[in-house]
Structures are given as C-alpha cells and as structure tokens.
Amino acid sequence: RTDDDFTPVTMETVTSESGTQFEGALPKQPAAGKLQYYIEAEIAGQARRFPEQADQFVLIRFKDPVPDGVLIPHVTLMIISILLGMRSGLSALFAPYNMKQLAWATLCGMTVGGMILGPMVQKYAFGEYWTGFPLGGDWTDNKMLFMFLAWVFACSVVGLNPRKKNTTTGRIAVFTATIVMTVCYLIPHSMGGSDLDYSQVDKGGDPSKAIETGRK
C-alpha cells in the first residue's frame, strides 16, 4: 500500500477492424502489486467519470505468468470438484446409494487440483508455495485448507467399503462438507490474498521479499 498521488495517463485513440477505441497503458507492477485507477472522459460534451462515485476506483492486482500446463488442470479440477461436491451433498440428502464414490472423487479432485496444483500456481504467480495457515493469513489458501479437511473428515467417516451401509452420521458428514465447500466458494477468490508492501520496495528491498500474506 502507498500514499502516492494519482498519476495522470493520457489515453490514445486506436482504430482497428473492430472499430475505434481509447487505450491507456498502466505501469507494470511486481507480483502481488496493486494499482487503483479511474477514467475521466468527455462524452457528448459532458465530463464523465468511471466509476461514477468520486471515492470509488478500479483495483487490479499483478502476478507473474503461470504456465497453462499448471493453470488449466488446476482450474478444471477445482470446477469438477465443486460439481462433484454439490452432487455428493444432494446424494447425502436424497439418494445415498453412490454417496461414498462421489465423496471420494471430490476429495481426489480437491487433493490434486487444490493441494498439489494450487501451491504450484501460487509459486509461479507470487513466489511462494503456501501462504495460508500456519505460514501466513492468505484467505485463498485457508479456504482450500478448510475445504480439504472437511472432505478428509467426511471420507474418513463414510469409509472406503462401497458395500458398507450408509449411516446417518456419514450422510451428515458429507452434507456438512458440501456446506463448508459452498461457503468457501462464495468468498471472493482473491480476498485477503498476497499483497505487495510498497514501503519496503521504496526502501530498495527486493519486491519478491516484500509480499504480505493476508495477515494485515
């Protein structure tokens, strides 16, 4: 975070096959660095501001590039995991005949997508494998940890034997894991994420060593 004043950047008119548009370049920031900006323009003779409220700004966060070979499987498996998790919860409520298989499939997808590929994405993007508990306060990592532990608990309750009769306790455990997962997914993905401490950078510090992890 910094108290620096806004720096004006003049937008340029760019014409292409798709039409004419205004473009302006924002200065690139180190990984986890953030910029706030707003746009002022004159449209039909009237001054306009975007966003309209004077105390509101657009916030963007920068990251280092993540290889598609890591990012795409991570995103795909996390989407599949939440779909399987929701299906597991419905199965626990109404038709638990395949609840165990669905719960274990959810845990497997979350293990590979979230606990293995997730830290790899974090390492490429922000330079650290894990910035959640107990190493830091990154909300995204902590959400992943809560979801993972919820499904580990649910699967430990229902067990591996597909022939073993489903119990009320097992159904409650699976449904609870679904609720925990749903609540975690409702929290915005980047909330409480890695944040660059510009005060350290201004003192000449290495930007990769000046990344906070959500505790502040």
Ranges and model annotations:
Residues 128-131, 135, 140-216:
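Generic detector of multi-pass transmembrane helix bundles and their immediately adjacent loops
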